[in-house]
Amino acid sequence: KHDLGRHCLLARRLLESGVSFVQLSHSNYDTHNENFNFHIEQLAEFDFAFSTFVADLAQRGMLESTLIVVLSEFGRTPNVNLYQGRDHWSRAWSVCLAGTRMPRGHVFGATNDKGTEVIDKQVDHGNLFHTYLQSVGVDSTANFNIDGRDMPIADPASRPIDGLLV
């Protein structure tokens, strides 16, 4: 019914054919005005397509070998602006992980009551990257060689998210 649903179906077919990485996009969440009216439609489309995609992979036995990551480059302000929108907010936002080695129905970390600050288990992009790699069986502490020079696969100062992978 929607482009995202068709793209999820194509992604599943690509994964079935052996493609190892697929990226989907669902854009236009940058709602500085009319946030609520727009998101009623936008989130309904995402919710149906995403939940169907996850169920589809699980039904085919592919979820245990597929990592699904849903994220944005920043969050939205906890408060509504003058135009009934939400602006950019970099201090706290959510990431959804599903599939290989990810616990089902698990909430990791917390924000304060206003959603403005992380108060428990704050992580950064380095932690996420290590976690992604480890979840698909790549040793995130290993190196790879570029023209005779060893380079770390991931930031050596970072590590996977403690207690997340099962």
Show the residue positions of the predicted features:
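Ligand-binding pockets and gating/stacking loops
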Residues: 1-166
